[in-house]
């Protein structure tokens, strides 16, 4: 039985068990796969169309989830990231190009787009758009050709791990899309290498992230590519207190600004089935962040930094997501969504804020090493 030593109020003694995180992630992932049937490509594909913040302001944005086998990092020996379950929403086996394209075209046809509308398109692959083993090159190229033929796509947004951000792949893409804006979003999660590698099990370093960003910046300068970078920042990994989560997210935003990342997107933790974070949560060793913590982060960043910063509201107000109280959960979620478009601070008061402040202000006081509980993770 693997055990973790837990200090009072989420202050953890991690020596001796941090090395087990990767093994635990792999074990939980394997068990999750055994309990459920892989999805069909048709079940994986999805799309929606609404207003979103683009580099030219608020505009119509088409979101398309492409059917893929799943993230190569999660399907490999690493077991993937401790908070992510996207691979559970994939086929877990290769998909032929024709099937991918058929489903892409089906979803594209569901959203009639007026010729006068200038739109942004976000392509999600539940992994890395730039990894040819997840999304075959011929499928990728045909998708991009199709979008260019629409005549009114001004931005294309994709996601990728940094190791797939290669000059060869970007050359191939810009040969098709010309001067269209192309943003690569990378899940940096945190600027703290120890947190990213040992608590999130991300599998790449800050240097790897910097190299990907620098490559894109260099290609923009030398080849004129209309390239942008975005960093996803994860709010409150396991083995991190509420106060530490706030400080680390803000510090990560400052770091991204210092290396000229173009945009930020904060992703507060939600509890997904078949993940390490769910195991901690079920054992009483983890709780998603307060919504107040998320607001503190986004307000500070919008005050300090001159760069677009978004705050994801997935799971807000639910048992498995960021939560304040029943009085303010819904109001704050709606305010955050609206303020993502205006990039303004969120001003709101509720009685539950006192409880949040007490937890934050007493963070150091609660870091006692006297009473140690043993929490079995298996």
Segments (PLM) and residue ranges:
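Canonical Radical SAM [4Fe-4S] cluster-binding loop centered on the CxxxCxxC motif
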Residues: 44, 53-102
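Distinct, well-ordered alpha-helical segments
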Residues: 133-141, 166-175, 243
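Auxiliary Fe-S-binding modules of radical SAM enzymes
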Residues: 5, 10-11, 18-34, 43, ...
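Conserved C-terminal portion of the radical SAM core fold
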Residues: 207-275, 294-313
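Acidic-and-aromatic substrate-binding clefts and catalytic sites of carbohydrate-active enzymes
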Residues: 92, 96, 163-168, 238-243, ...
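Core AdoMet radical
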Residues: 85-107, 111-136, 150-166, 180-209, ...
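Well-ordered, non-membrane alpha-helical segments in soluble/globular domains
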Residues: 94-109, 135-146, 204-212, 245-253, ...
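Acidic (Asp/Glu)-rich catalytic clusters
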Residues: 111-113, 147-148, 172-181, 217-220, ...
């Amino acid at each position: 039985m693997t055990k973790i030593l837990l200090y009072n109020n989420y202050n953890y003694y991690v020596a001796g068990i941090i090395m087990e995180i990767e093994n635990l992630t792999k074990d939980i992932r394997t068990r999750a796969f055994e309990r459920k049937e892989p999805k069909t490509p048709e079940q994986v594909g999805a799309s929606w169309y609404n207003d979103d913040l683009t580099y030219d302001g608020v505009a119509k944005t088409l979101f398309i989830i492409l059917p893929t086998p799943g993230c190569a990092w999660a399907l490999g020996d690493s077991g993937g990231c401790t908070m992510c379950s996207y691979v559970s929403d994939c086929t877990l086996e290769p998909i032929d190009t024709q099937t991918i394209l058929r489903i892409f075209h089906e979803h594209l046809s569901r959203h009639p787009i007026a010729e006068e509308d200038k739109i942004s398109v976000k392509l999600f692959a539940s992994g890395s758009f730039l990894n040819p083993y997840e999304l075959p090159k011929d499928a990728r190229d045909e998708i991009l050709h199709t979008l260019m033929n629409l005549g009114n796509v001004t931005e294309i947004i994709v996601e990728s791990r940094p190791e797939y951000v290669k000059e060869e792949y970007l050359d191939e893409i810009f040969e098709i899309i010309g001067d269209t804006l192309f943003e690569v979003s990378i899940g940096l999660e945190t600027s703290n290498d120890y947190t990213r590698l040992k608590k999130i099990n991300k599998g790449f370093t800050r240097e790897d992230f910097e190299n990907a960003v620098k490559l894109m910046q260099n290609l923009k300068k030398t080849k004129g590519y209309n390239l942008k970078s975005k960093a996803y920042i994860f709010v409150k990994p396991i083995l991190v207190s509420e106060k530490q989560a706030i400080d680390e997210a803000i510090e990560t935003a400052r770091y991204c600004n210092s290396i000229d990342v173009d945009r930020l997107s904060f992703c507060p933790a939600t509890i997904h089935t078949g993940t390490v974070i769910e195991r901690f949560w079920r054992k009483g060793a983890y709780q998603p962040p307060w919504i107040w913590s998320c607001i503190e982060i986004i307000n500070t960043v919008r005050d300090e930094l001159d760069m677009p910063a978004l705050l994801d509201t997935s799971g807000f107000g639910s048992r498995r997501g960021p939560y304040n109280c029943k009085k303010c959960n819904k109001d704050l979620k709606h305010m955050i969504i609206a303020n993502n478009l205006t990039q303004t601070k969120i001003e709101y008061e509720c009685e539950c804020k006192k409880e949040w402040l007490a937890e934050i202000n007493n963070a150091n006081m609660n870091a006692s090493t006297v009473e140690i509980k043993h929490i079995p993770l298996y």
